[in-house]
Amino acid sequence: MAMDERRGKERVQWTTTIIISSSLKSYEIATALENRSHKVRYSDTLESGSIVFSLSGVAFLLMDAKECMTSAEEIFVTKIEKFINIHQNSFLVLFAPLHGPEEWSLMFRIHQRFLGSNLRILPVHNTVNALDLMCTIAKTTSKPHIDSICYRMITTKAYIIEQSPVWRTLQKIKLSSDSVSADSGE
């Protein structure tokens, strides 16, 4: 396959089915996902503020940092807890125009509270930032793309092992140290 053909294939827009909480129906993020040609479905049963990329198996909970800081901690902690208990591959998308000391403190408290869980925190500044991150994560974890990424990594590793002068030098050093340790063991 020629390089130009591969580039052309990479430019093809990725689309998938996305389930969005009905609470986000009037928000900019829902419209933006629809504008990217994704198949958007709304659900009343999904946790408020949630977006699920069903084919990728990833779920995102959108929360505003200011709202979290002004509400009682147990309210948003309970919401996050419920979310991660339902979704195995979960991300908290924390919106703040600027991530200052208060926002980082909030993220630290959330991180400490959910340490060891399947929750990852994504600090974002705006809708475009959030969309790019969510779509990148969902795309790279979807079946055809994850297989392609794994194949590329295996191919790259094999190339490095076969072609790298550094790797060859390391192998020679290891071989010479193996022969030294074999000689000293006699």
UniProtKB/Swiss-Prot annotation:
Lineage: superkingdom: Eukaryota
Principal place of residence: nucleus
Key words, A-Z: Chromosome, Meiosis
Tissues and organs where the protein is expressed, per its UniProt entry: Testis (at protein level).
Keyword flag Transferase: no
One Pfam family, short name: SCRE
Keyword presence, Magnesium: no
Phenotype when the gene is knocked out: Mice show a massive germline loss and infertility in both males and females. Defects in meiotic prophase progression and meiotic recombination seen in spermatocytes and oocytes. Meiocytes fail to achieve complete synapsis and show repair of double-strand breaks without formation of crossovers.
GO biological process, one term: synaptonemal complex assembly
Subcellular location: Chromosome
GO cellular component term of the entry, any: chromosome
Function in brief: Plays a key role in reinforcing the integrity of the central element of the synaptonemal complex (SC) thereby stabilizing SC, ensuring progression of meiotic prophase I in male and female germ cells. Promotes homologous recombination and crossing-over in meiotic prophase I via its association with SHOC1. Required for the localization of TEX11 and MSH4 to recombination intermediates.
Assembly mode: Homooligomer. Interacts with SHOC1. Interacts with SYCP1 and SYCE3.
Protein name, per record: Protein SPO16 homolog
Designated gene of the protein: Spo16
